[in-house]
Amino acid sequence: MSVIKVLEIMSYSDKNWEDAAAKAVAEAGKTVKNIRSIYIQDHSAVVHENKLTEFRINAKISFEVSPNHAE
């Protein structure tokens, strides 16, 4: 049986929401192994002089927990 944990992460990009999601996964991947999915819960943008300047997401990243083999 697999156990899945979920992290809630906020990320941003000056390019687009897809890049913000990729950054969230890359950053989480530095300390979390076995990432299985990302769910974009919410997204927003910062507007400056009538232009979108920052793309923000709130995401949930799920990962499989490795069983502890220590006995």
Model-predicted regions and their roles:
Residues 1-3, 69-70:
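Extreme N-terminus of proteins, especially the signal/transit-peptide cleavage junction
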Residues 9-11, 43, 57-63:
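A structural signal for short, well-ordered beta-strand segments
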Residues 16-17, 47, 68:
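Short beta-strands and strand-coil junctions in structured, solvent-facing domains, enriched
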Residues 38-47:
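Short, conserved loop-to-beta-strand elements that form functional interface hotspots
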Residues 50-71:
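C-terminal structural segments of small proteins and small subunits
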